[in-house]
Design a protein with these regions (language model features):
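Conserved alpha/beta-domain cores
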Residues: 1-176
Length: 176
């Protein structure tokens, strides 16, 4: 695993160089954007190595993998605290696994999904499993491809207005 850790450290440094250079070219401060390590397809040991290499913000695209990673990482109290987000399609039957585990859900593209998240968040908040409204990004389908998720750009304002009425979610931005 030492070789993997060395590889992770070196790769992270290369990525950060390019990341900061892009921010510099855009005239933005280095803290204006976040580097998110997508940990899908790797196990808990590899995620531990990524944390040891300096990554602190992760994302998963499957709720069961998110829960598995968090459970596995709980066995490593020596590690610094990290953040996990949920990316990718979220089915309503998987919402409970994500609430209280993911700090941000990146893929809310419909009123139906947002309502389901908001209503289930109430129960999680009452049970002390969620500290407040679930933070979400609205997924916008800018390509117009039917195979892609998200709201059409011409329906975005309407969806934002509808989601703003839901008291147990907080819109934090857009995901395209």
């Amino acid at each position: 695993m030492d070789n993997y850790l060395d590889l992770m450290r070196a790769r992270r440094e290369q990525i950060l160089e390019r990341f900061y250079a892009a921010l510099d070219r855009a005239g933005r401060p280095h803290d204006a954007a976040s580097l998110i390590a997508v940990s899908k397809t790797v196990g808990v040991d590899e995620t531990v190595a990524a944390i040891q290499a300096g990554y602190r913000h992760f994302a998963e695209n499957r709720p069961q993998e998110l829960v598995r990673k968090l459970t596995g990482l709980a066995e490593h109290p020596e590690l610094p605290e990290v953040r996990f987000d949920m990316i990718g399609n979220l089915q309503t039957n998987k919402i409970n696994a994500v609430l209280g585990s993911a700090e941000l859900i990146h893929s809310v593209g419909s009123l139906h999904l947002a309502q389901a998240i908001s209503s289930r968040a109430v129960r999680k908040i009452e049970a002390g499993e969620l500290s407040g409204p679930q933070r979400v990004l609205i997924e916008v389908n800018v390509s117009g491809e039917e195979s892609k998720g998200g709201v059409a750009p011409d329906k975005l304002r309407e969806l934002i207005a509808q989601l703003a009425q839901l008291k147990n979610i907080r819109i934090k931005g857009l995901m395209t």
